[in-house]
Amino acid sequence: MAAASDTAVLDALVEIQRAQDPTLAFRYACRVGMCGSCAMVVNGRERRACRTRLESRGPGPVSVRPLYHFPLLGDLVVDMTLFAARLQDVGAALTPGENAEPYARVSGLSAERREIDLAIECIGCGMCVSASTMVGHNERFPGAAALNRTLTLGLDHRDGEREARWRVLLATTRLHAATGRATARRSAR
């Protein structure tokens, strides 16, 4: 399909679905890069289709495929059930401690916040799992998103499960199994 170079990959897919193939299946929700629903592999790199412009992919045709390491449901739609289960397996929800404040009161200027800041940008899109070679080698490896979430919660002073989270994070079958044997295939940015 011919499209302007500043067209987002997602917009091109919507147009293809509208004009050429109404059965084409893909996910999207927010269309502004916040939710990660439209994550897919574009010209061999994990991308959010709503934030990826056709022009940024260079001249010529653009190839799209579903994320790697996920069961395929149809066309560009993958099953995220195992991804969500891996987050649950590592305890990816805050468990308030006995003296935890009822509302998050972590100052944006505090050292704790600066330590956590980089890790809280994860939107749970699955691109890191797709880009990981370790996921393909060890089915017990929870993936970068789950490890990132565990780390973030392990650094939060309000969490009553901090010690347990660190044990999970450092468990031989989780993190140690991945170190030194595999790396991300490429950046998922």
What do the PLM-derived regions correspond to, one by one?
Residues 2, 41-45:
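Short strand-turn-strand beta-turns centered on an Asx-Gly dipeptide
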Residues 6-22, 64-189:
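Ferredoxin-type iron-sulfur electron-transfer modules in oxidoreductases and energy-metabolism complexes
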Residues 25-27:
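A cross-kingdom feature strongest in bacterial/archaeal respiratory oxidoreductases
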Residues 30-37:
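Short, structured protein-protein interaction patches enriched in aromatics and acidic/basic residues
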Residues 36, 60-62, 118:
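Structural beta-strand/beta-sheet cores of well-ordered domains, especially the beta-sheet scaffolds
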Residues 38, 58-59, 186-188:
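Extracellular/mature segments of secreted proteins
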Residues 39-40, 132:
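Short beta-strand scaffold segments in enzyme catalytic cores
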Residues 45-64:
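Glycine-rich phosphate/adenylate-binding loop and adjacent beta-alpha elements
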